């Protein structure tokens, strides 16, 4: 006989849970026989007591199998099914380029993404800026888009890992979000329900990351790789820098435009390109589309240079209801803020170097403009944000733009400008350049 309180007691007392304990508890989450209080109690017990590798694997499997698991064999795809997940940050627009790049190289990317909350942007919110684009298509359209364009970026349906939705909602209000075992199971349950052959994790470290500390980021990366591989999915992780915005834009429409400029070759921010290329290459090697990282990176450059990646993006947008000429006329389709004005520094800053950015505060400036959420049901202004974000190490002069702020009115612009200035530190000497990619995690780590 299953008693939820007995499972909670075992974990409270640091006794390992069996696969059956975990499966029955997750079943109870789905059929409502387990209460919110019991979910909260188990989450807190796991937060303090942790989980073994086997427990994490069992929880991931139980949550993955609580709903549909996509099976692509019926679609006769002639390549591997691959995806990437990022732990989130500011100016992190990688998904919009990586999906089409991998598709152009022969992979298939059924990317199920989320919305932003707090200082981190959400991939789905960016796509809401494209008129007509359906982030919640029916299953047939989703599968057809994956088959024809090679990539479809959509939102989570209620039929994929439904146990996670209820579990996460409880964690969110009980201070148990930061548990590495629970993060591992939550991320992988959703991603592995996509029916993947290969997965790369972009785990952010730095002051704009979900887990700012490097040790915690590394532990999370190791946990994700270990459990993913135990479940038969070729999984690797890169730990990447989030001590400043990854791209030169932060917001929704402005990040879509940044992605279009990247894919069409109009502009490729150096740090953004490094991370996009490295993550794409990981997937090409994991999916046996390339024999080595060097070969994979050449393939990435080729599909960008030839325009094949841009074509895949355009095909995806058209297939999911967006304009077929979006790539050519993105500036006409994307919403534009009423006020777009550059932020410059007074003369006393001239000659100094931008030495540090409080990236979380930079992201919160976008929230203040209306481009991000404080609560899950907040409505967004998709036109606002910032572009031309100055990178750490830049020398300030009379022409330097810290950022161009896109706001709906003058008072919002001023509030954002004040927040941005408070987030920046300057020095008389240039700072040591930071790595963008700190470490690669692969193989058996637990």
UniProtKB/Swiss-Prot annotation:
GO terms for molecular function: 1,4-alpha-oligoglucan phosphorylase activity; thymidine phosphorylase activity. PROSITE patterns: THYMID_PHOSPHORYLASE (PS00647). InterPro entries: Glycosyl_Trfase_fam3, Glycosyl_Trfase_fam3_N_dom, Glycosyl_Trfase_fam3_N_dom_sf, Nuc_phospho_transferase, PYNP-like_C_sf, PYNP_C, Pyrmidine_PPas_bac/euk, Pyrmidine_PPase_CS. One of its GO terms (biological process) is thymidine metabolic process. Gene3D superfamilies: Nucleoside phosphorylase/phosphoribosyltransferase catalytic domain, Pyrimidine nucleoside phosphorylase-like, C-terminal domain, Transferase, Pyrimidine Nucleoside Phosphorylase, Chain C. The enzymes which catalyze the reversible phosphorolysis of pyrimidine nucleosides are involved in the degradation of these compounds and in their utilization as carbon and energy sources, or in the rescue of pyrimidine bases for nucleotide synthesis. Belongs to the thymidine/pyrimidine-nucleoside phosphorylase family. NCBIfam families: PRK05820.1, T_phosphoryl, Y_phosphoryl. This is Thymidine phosphorylase. It comes from Idiomarina loihiensis (strain ATCC BAA-735 / DSM 15497 / L2-TR). The lineage of its organism: Bacteria, Pseudomonadati, Pseudomonadota, Gammaproteobacteria, Alteromonadales. The gene is deoA.
